[in-house]
Amino acid sequence: YISTFSKAKSTTVKSNLSVKQMLNAIKTDNSGAKQIKRYTDGGVNISKYKTTYDKFKAIYVWHAKNFKKHGWNCVGCNSNFNNCLAALFAKSQKRYDSFITLEAGKVKNNDGSRPIHKWAAIYLAGKPYIFDPRLQGYTKSYTPTTYFAIAKGSKRAKAIYIYENGYGTFYPDE
């Protein structure tokens, strides 16, 4: 109940939090569970998880482990991943700053080449974080947790990749 004297406050994500804390500041329900189950061949049931971070991570890890089985290239995998995230955040009242899909055509590697790639990027507290379940393929360790949130300013950023596009420059992060 909100009286005429009350003000409803929206949640804004604080900037000094970890990615986990920032994702958990975004309240999500299970309304997208059916869609996510369909997109993941029944592999992810977000209703089993309590926090937004755990739901998000389950979707991420499923894609990282199963993209080869489905014969997906980067674009196919990330299109499906983005569909899952869109379903997860559908009723979150956009408490994150913005949710964008970065298309491969707008992106350049630091050597000028164009990767055939696509990401889900979420602005949390004004900073872009790219969540890409396939980026672990660029490292020697193929575990799905090699990369989770990609943010600007990591120690290893310049040694690996710099991505440029209309939204700014993105640096991979651990």
Locate the predicted segments by residue.
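Hydrophobic/aromatic-rich core segments of domains that either
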Residues: 79-155
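Intrinsic-disorder/low-complexity loop/linker signature
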Residues: 32, 42-43, 94, 112, ...
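Extended low-polarity, hydrophobic cluster-rich segments
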Residues: 56-64, 121-124, 151, 160-163
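Low-complexity, Gly/Ser/Thr/Pro-rich intrinsically disordered linker/tail segments
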Residues: 152-174
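N-terminal compositionally biased, intrinsically disordered segments and leader/signal-like regions
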Residues: 5, 12-13, 41, 140, ...
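Secondary-structure boundary elements
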Residues: 4-73, 83
